[in-house]
Amino acid sequence: IVNTGTVLQVGDGIARIAQIPVSEAYLGRVINALAKPIDGRLIESPAPGIISRASSVAQVVNALQERKFLVELRTQFQEIISSTKLRNQADQTITLIR
């Protein structure tokens, strides 16, 4: 990669793009630019137990409830806007053109 004695300047050429190994061991890890873990865990650390993992079911249920609420809120706003438009046009004279 880069030696400590190398000075990089704008316009310097690149010999090749840095590559890192990819495996299941890197999933969910925090790594630096040199693909070295910086989260304090070993590369082959065991996965957390099922009990200690956060439940995603509650998050999905909350997200669905929020979506349903927002859809209902949008519908109510549309009804308010359309009724306001009708109310604002109630005093106007309508001319039909044939």
UniProtKB/Swiss-Prot annotation:
According to its UniProt entry, what is the function of this protein? Produces ATP from ADP in the presence of a proton gradient across the membrane. The alpha chain is a regulatory subunit.
Similarity annotation: Belongs to the ATPase alpha/beta chains family.
Q: Which protein is depicted?
A: ATP synthase subunit alpha, chloroplastic
Per the record, the GO terms for biological process are: ATP biosynthetic process; proton transmembrane transport
Q: Which reaction does it catalyse?
A: ATP + H2O + 4 H(+)(in) = ADP + phosphate + 5 H(+)(out)
Q: Which superkingdom, per the lineage?
A: Eukaryota
Gene3D superfamilies from the UniProt entry? 3.40.50.12240
List the EC numbers from the record: 7.1.2.2
Q: Which gene encodes it?
A: atpA
Q: Name the UniProt key words of this record, in alphabetical order.
A: ATP synthesis, ATP-binding, CF(1), Chloroplast, Hydrogen ion transport, Ion transport, Membrane, Nucleotide-binding, Plastid, Thylakoid, Translocase, Transport
The protein's GO terms of the molecular function aspect are: ATP binding
Q: Identify which top EC class this enzyme belongs to.
A: translocase
Mind telling me which GO cellular component terms the entry cites?
chloroplast thylakoid membrane; proton-transporting ATP synthase complex
The protein's location, in the record's own words, is: Plastid, Chloroplast thylakoid membrane
Q: How does it assemble?
A: F-type ATPases have 2 components, CF(1) - the catalytic core - and CF(0) - the membrane proton channel. CF(1) has five subunits: alpha(3), beta(3), gamma(1), delta(1), epsilon(1). CF(0) has four main subunits: a, b, b' and c.
Primary localization class, coarse: plastid
Kindly give the membrane topology term recorded for this protein: Peripheral membrane protein
- Disulfide links within the chain: none
**Which organism is the protein's source?**
Populus euphratica (Euphrates poplar)
